[in-house]
Amino acid sequence: MAATNIWAALPAKKRPLHQRARRPAGGRGREPEVPFTTDPSGNPAGRNCLEFLPPGGTSGCSATDGGATVPLALRPFLRERRPLGSQHPCPWHYLQVSDYDDSLAPTCFRAHLHRRGSSSTLNQASAMTDPNPRTAEASGLYTYSSRPRAVACQRRRHRDSILQPVEEPMSYGNIMYDRRVIRGNTYALPTGQVPGQPDPLELQRQQQARRRALARKRAQEQLKPRTPEPVEGRKHVDIQTELYLEEIADRIVEVDMECQTDAFLDRPPTPLFIPAKTGKDVATQILGGELFDFDLEVKPMLEVLVGKTIEQSLLEVMEEEELANLRARQYAYEEIRNVELAEVQRLEEQERRHREEKERRKKQQWEIVHKRNETLQKISALIFARQYLANLLPSVFDKLRNSGFFYDPIERDIEVGFLPWLMNEVEKSMEHSMVGRTVLDMLIRDVVERRINDYEHKEAMPPGQKTNVINGPNTVTDPSVTTLHTQKPVLDRVSSQPAPSQERKPVEEGGHLMAE
């Protein structure tokens, strides 16, 4: 706060740029307005600007009604004045054209350009520009409202010639030797660079930069002192030769400083805004019965109320009658609608029956046609088969008859049922006869073998013993007894033989023996 007050005490021209630029957008400060004297001798030192009117007043201004001698209490321009484009003494007679030009174009805005505020502002502006000093004295302190405008940029967008060196060497060159200038035919110009391919100039520039970096690195390596190469079998190793701990002998000067700032004060409450009173208060007294006579004024009101009441009653009665008529019509319509719905249902049912009958008859007719087609197909197939098989059936029947497919049932029954039984019975009887024959043959064979054995034994004995043997007491001459003794082993031997056909050979052998 102290620094701000110091800069505020200095003239506007001697303030720094950042202090001069901190102004509100309206162009006026918030400090209290203090009337300035019109005496040029009262200006502070170093202020060479046209902030005050000349002693003789202004000459020829339509906005200020000619040469006014009234001292203005506040300067219209709060920032440092620039050289005016015109020598007109009116402070409202100049307007800045642009931020890039220091000169001001001489213009003059009429009073309606400055009257953008309320009626009080207009009165104050008229009092400020009134040439009569009594009016200004009667109004006392006045306020000034300027035309809103954008804040001027204090920083220049282009450097001044002061900041540039005075003697700057000028570089000259022939533009025809510039690589960016193309010489030759316009139709033989090189085509544009294909997207995706690097620029040859850029590649050349990168290669040159890479070569320069390699050359610089090679030169640095050559200039840098090197340690001799180690002998064979050894290698260089970095070793710490400096001290690990270093004593800090420098004493740092320490100074203690302290600063106490003022405590923050609470923001005072904002005062209420009370606008200035612009109108006049006027009072009028009206006594009772002067403006309103009840007996006279109540008649139209009663007429309106009674008329509206009767009209509303009539409307309600008409509405009730209309509702009754609507209900009667609705009932009649409901009856007609029910009758029509019943008729519609009857017609729908009739249509449904007709449709079902139609579908049934169509199905029946389709079945008849289908059966007729099947019958025709069968008849045609039968006729075709008869015609085709007329010459084929006799030969087929003959072959089947010859093959045994067509036979006499009685003959087949005899062949299948009777003949096999007869053959079995014959075979059984033959088997029994064969068994009897076999038994008989075996008995005869046994007897013959015994006799042969006896005969051979007799021939081998001396002559005196032959009679004893033949006529001895133990000699059995009855053949039946011999047969009874030998019947059992013969029967056992016959039962062990399987078939009579196999016994033919022994029978034949027995026959031969018997023949012998």
Swiss-Prot record:
Cellular component, GO annotation: 9+2 motile cilium; radial spoke head
Annotated Polar residues bias: 120-129, 465-486
Protein family (similarity comment): Belongs to the flagellar radial spoke RSP3 family.
Biased composition (Basic and acidic residues): 218-233, 502-516
PANTHER family, sorted: FLAGELLAR RADIAL SPOKE PROTEIN 3, RADIAL SPOKE HEAD PROTEIN 3 HOMOLOG
Basic residues composition bias: residue spans: 12-25, 208-217
Sites of Phosphothreonine modification: 270
Function: May function as part of axonemal radial spoke complexes that play an important part in the motility of sperm and cilia. Functions as a protein kinase A-anchoring protein that scaffolds the cAMP-dependent protein kinase holoenzyme. May serve as a point of convergence for MAPK and PKA signaling in cilia.
Assembly notes: May be a component of axonemal radial spokes. Interacts with IQUB. Interacts with phosphorylated MAPK1. Interacts with MEK1. Interacts with PKA regulatory subunits PRKAR1A and PRKAR1B. Interacts with RSPH1. Interacts with RSPH4A. Interacts with RSPH6A. Interacts with RSPH9. Interacts with CFAP61. Interacts with LRRC23.
Listed name of the protein: Radial spoke head protein 3 homolog A
Entry-linked InterPro entries: Radial_spoke_3
Highest taxon of source: Eukaryota
Compartment(s): Cytoplasm, Cytoskeleton, Cilium axoneme; Cytoplasm, Cytoskeleton, Flagellum axoneme
Signal peptide: none
